[in-house]
Regions:
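Beta-sheet entry/capping signal
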Residues: 115, 148, 367-368, 389-391, ...
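N-terminal signal peptide c-region/cleavage motif recognized by signal peptidases
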Residues: 14-15
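Active-site region of glycoside hydrolase catalytic domains
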Residues: 202, 206, 216-219, 304, ...
Length: 961
């Protein structure tokens, strides 16, 4: 990235030389007064303009439009008032220029086109939201007066994807954001003034290679341009920090000449760096950054200066059995990330707000963000990713529509500018041509060539976001947690090879907390569910999120909600469980064949009820906490599908550890028969199996041979019936007269058979037994089966074969069973409570905790309603405030002083001054469970400005409140 505002490079530059000075002309700078009005007509008045930003956001800020985030206001706006051209006018004084200096006016981007005039003089025409404009205005500014800057912005027009690209493809609405009136037309990127001499430094570029961890090679390229009509001689000086690598290089330029200067270790031996500080993704090491300060001097005077921040790193790319793998600095990277659709649907995320959002991604232990369809162009986003060790999968502005932009030339120019502007960022790992499609000819070849030439081939160009080594897109709806562990969690309609692989999109609806919900939903629309919810995409407008299924699952898992507050509370448990399982399911198969996963979506652009981790107000949902737990670099996890426990190490260091598993009943009593402990050596970048939690101990059918009358490709085959995996299933052909049988190996005695049905269950069936597999006797029959988990008690039986004989299907499909289990039950043996708890711990040699994990499990698949029978929890809360370095921390200790389990405790700090939540914050945990007498310390860290008077309160509330 190239720092522009008051960049200082002092150490080896000539004494007394000032760095390049830049004067920002954004609307918050105080250096200019902006206003905007329609180019023609009086449909709207002139209002103060937000620059950078879109036209519509300026009118919202001016109060002309009601808050478009609230209720259905976004849909009530008369978009015809904004779907037109607008004129921006800015008034600014002339800054001191100095003799022999040139004053430049720079535009970083206008959406979609813009004509620029200064004091009545046309400077140029901008075409595309990443095309820059660089204008010498030295002789055009008023010497001692005010200057009038005008920008005529042409709106985007219809249709948007992909015809109007380069632009914000989702601006006409998507299934996660409304139509943005004006289609985000406006001055959408930075505007500033700068000063230089006759010679300018243009597009400096730092490239790095890492042959091994102890050595790196740095290459510096920069264009040097002589803007004068005379030849000149000068010196290019620079210093790289840390390391103090200083250099100077003489340069002679003819009049008007522009030349590329290339410096390598041959010209500057120090560019062969010993013991470099490498840039690592989050969880693998520190994202070390260097600065390269450049200045060009003529006659002992600085003509221009630039500071480039870069990271020493080298990406690598491999395909194992056709599956994509990413490497950095020679090490494989297991990718854990999220899709970032837009920063904010009206472009109102700016400056330090990017750092806040990217820091939340780092705190979730993510190491990658996908910049979906290149919808974020602000350099502050990339700066934040560099600082926080978040790699970027960076798309260009094409969706899967089989059509080309109307103006291929403008697209190509903007694509080249994007690469050149952003290539110094170490965070960019992949350039991607098209979302879920291959760019239509000639763009695919053009983009591949652009990356090869302007990025030097240092990073991969990937044509399509969900194929060519990737495992598809989706699905985007919630499933039972075990589904993510079983072969294979594939998107609907996927025609490639089934795999976990590298999935660039998979997600689920994620409902907000109640306190966020009430900020954007009118009270009369709170409950019951209604069409207003669909204005925030909980309905048919976001069908891919399956909100109906999500709503039903909350009720099935936790019972019918009695109102919106109860629904939001229960929804957070679904958010946490499913999103944690999504990442843990992939990690369960790490390198076999899973190589990466990115949720759809990690960053909300609009107050939404689907696809997010934290919400629009930066309140972490249950999804955030589930993902944070799953993605920790050293992790212990349980499989919902087969009850196995694994340890996962995505760091670069091996470790010795002890793994412990304990199971507790609903009352918090330890069930010692399930306790297991194992010492383990865990290699770097691996997942290792530890042991199984055998909740089906005594199951005579486990892993026994199975035969069936038929098997449909809808299922995993007959063997799935006894594999102990609650998410693999047998499915029959679509006929009533179907059967499936288990061979127990010999004649066995038993008293109980358990059948776990998928939705396609039997309405009527028989249970039959046989000693020889030919002659069968009936021991159970039903004509009114309801599906789900059915436990069939029997008088003591003896047989070798057990058969389910279908008589009548309950659906149009065949019969489908997850499991058949066969037991001889001792009436006196203790039974698991309907809901019980699993606690896992991983500790180091000294007993220090490396990872812990907590699950709730039901004896009936997905039925957690027994949690509603827990006695109310009694919690004691103590807290203390400290401050340092512009941050404040509320250290909170929550203790369970009651007799019941305190399940899913949510803790939130509030300001006393206005009763509002203190957001955003970072903390270690939330929605945690405390057994009797246990306590948990949580540190809430946040910006000091969020609590200026130090007056706060902390609320802790368990699910069983």
């Amino acid at each position: 990235m190239i720092k522009r505002i008051f960049a200082l490079c002092l150490s080896l530059l000539a004494a007394g030389v000032s760095a390049q000075e830049c004067i920002p002309l954004d609307s918050r700078s105080g250096h200019i007064r902006w206003e905007v009005r329609p180019s023609e007509g009086d449909a709207l008045p002139a209002v103060p303009a937000i620059v950078p930003g879109c036209v519509f956001a300026s009118y919202v800020a001016a109060g002309v439009e009601a808050d478009p985030n609230f209720g259905d206001n976004a849909y009530r706006t008369d978009k015809s008032r904004y779907d037109r051209n607008f004129r921006y006018t800015g008034l600014f004084p002339t800054p001191p220029v100095g003799e022999g200096r040139t004053l430049w006016l720079r535009f970083e981007g206008v959406n979609r086109k813009g004509t620029v005039r200064l004091n009545g003089h046309q400077l140029g025409h901008l075409d595309g939201f990443m095309q820059p404009g660089d204008y010498d205005i030295t002789r055009l500014v008023a010497p001692d007066g005010e200057n009038r800057l005008e920008v005529e912005v042409e709106w985007v027009g219809y249709p948007v994807p992909n015809f109007r690209s380069p632009t914000y493809i989702s601006s006409a609405g998507w299934d996660w954001m409304p139509y943005a009136p004006g289609l985000l037309s406006g001055i959408t990127d930075d505007v500033y003034l700068s000063l230089s001499g006759d010679v300018r430094l243009v597009e400096p570029w730092v490239r790095t290679k890492v042959p091994d961890r102890e050595h790196a090679k740095v290459e510096l390229l920069t264009d040097v341009e002589n803007r004068s009509d005379k030849a000149c001689e000068g010196v290019l000086r620079g210093e790289i920090r840390p390391g103090g690598i200083a250099f100077s290089h003489p340069v002679r330029l003819e009049a008007g000449e522009r030349r590329t200067i290339r410096l390598t270790e041959r010209e500057v031996p120090g560019l062969a760096v010993e013991h470099p500080q490498l840039w690592w993704p989050n969880g693998m090491g520190d994202p070390a950054l260097y600065t390269c300060c450049l200045a060009f001097e003529t006659d002992g005077r600085q003509s221009d200066a630039r500071t480039v921040t870069f990271g020493i790193r080298e990406y690598g790319y491999e395909w194992h059995d056709g599956i994509f793998r990413l490497k950095i600095n020679g090490e494989p990277v297991y990718v854990k990330g999220g899709n970032w659709g837009m920063s904010e649907w009206l472009l109102r995320c700016r400056g330090e707000e990017y750092d806040t959002r990217v820091a939340l991604h780092r705190h979730m232990h993510f190491n990658m963000i996908r910049n979906w369809i290149g919808s974020t162009t602000d350099e502050e986003f990339y700066d934040a990713c560099d600082r926080h060790g978040i790699m970027v999968w960076d798309d260009f502005w094409l969706n899967s529509h089989p059509n080309l932009p109307h103006d291929l030339g403008a697209f190509q120019q903007n694509a080249v500018e994007k690469i050149k502007r952003l290539r110094n960022h170490p965070s960019i790992a992949v350039w991607c041509g098209d979302n879920e499609g291959v760019p239509q000819a000639p763009l695919d070849d053009w983009l591949r060539g652009d990356v090869a030439h302007y990025d030097g081939g240092d990073r991969l160009y990937q044509s399509i976001s969900n194929a060519q080594g990737l495992s598809g897109s989706g699905p985007w709806a919630n499933f039972h947690p075990g589904w993510y562990f079983a072969a294979y969690p594939m998107p609907y309609g996927y025609k490639g090879r089934p795999a976990w692989g590298f999935r660039t999109e998979i997600g689920t609806a994620v409902f907000t907390t109640f306190e966020s919900f009430r900020k954007f939903m009118p009270e009369e629309s709170w409950w019951p569910r209604n069409d207003m919810w669909d204005k925030h995409f909980f309905g048919k407008s976001a069908a891919n999120a399956a909100p109906d299924k999500y709503f039903e699952t909350v009720a099935e898992n936790y019972g019918e909600a009695d109102g919106i507050e109860d629904f939001c509370r229960k929804a957070q448990l679904l958010n946490l469980e499913v999103n944690k399982a999504m990442y843990e399911g992939w990690q369960h198969h790490m390198w076999d064949d899973a190589t990466g996963i990115m949720t759809w979506m990690s960053q909300p652009a609009y107050p939404s009820l689907v696809w997010q981790t934290y919400d629009y107000y930066l309140d972490p949902t249950g999804a955030y906490w589930g993902i944070r737990k799953a993605c920790e670099p050293v992790h212990i996890q349980w499989s919902h599908a087969d009850n196995s426990v694994k340890a996962v190490n995505t760091t670069r260091e091996p470790l010795e550890a002890t793994a412990t598993a304990r199971v507790y009943d609903l009352d918090g009593r330890l069930l010692p028969q399930f306790t297991q402990q194992l010492r383990v050596s865990l290699a770097a970048n691996t997942a290792r199996s530890l042991f199984d939690l055998n909740f089906s101990e005594g199951n005579l059918a486990r892993n026994r041979p199975v035969k069936a009358s038929s098997s449909s490709p809808d299922g995993a085959g007959a063997g799935a019936l006894t594999d102990g995996n609650d998410s693999s299933r047998w499915a029959s052909e679509y006929n009533d007269d179907q059967w499936i049988e288990v061979d127990l190996g010999e004649r066995r005695a038993f008293t109980e058979v358990v059948l776990r049905w998928e939705d396609a269950h039997a309405a009527a069936y028989k249970l039959q037994l046989s000693d020889d597999g030919r002659t069968w006797r009936d021991v159970y029959e039903t004509q009114d089966a309801q599906g789900g988990e059915q436990t069939i008690p029997l008088p003591l039986q003896q047989a070798r074969y057990v058969r389910m004989l279908g008589l009548r299907r309950a659906t149009q499909w065949g019969y489908s069973l997850y499991e058949m289990e066969v037991y001889r039950r001792d009436a006196k043996a203790p039974k698991l409570s309907p809901v019980h708890f699993i606690r896992l711990e991983l500790t180091d040699r000294d007993g220090r905790l490396l990872s812990d994990n907590f699950y709730w499990r039901a004896t009936r698949r997905g039925d957690y309603t027994a949690l509603n029978t827990l006695a109310p929890a009694k919690l004691q809360v103590r807290s203390q405030l400290t401050a340092a370095g512009g941050r404040k921390v509320i250290r909170t200790t929550v203790r369970n002083v009651g007799r019941s389990v305190a399940f899913a405790v949510h803790v939130q700090p509030y300001r006393r001054s206005d009763g509002e939540r203190i957001l955003p914050y970072v903390a270690d945990d939330n929605y945690f469970t405390l057994l009797q007498g246990e306590s948990r310390q949580i540190d809430f860290e946040f910006d000091a400005s969020l609590l200026p008077d130090d007056r706060y309160t902390v609320r802790a509330e368990a699910y069983n409140r």
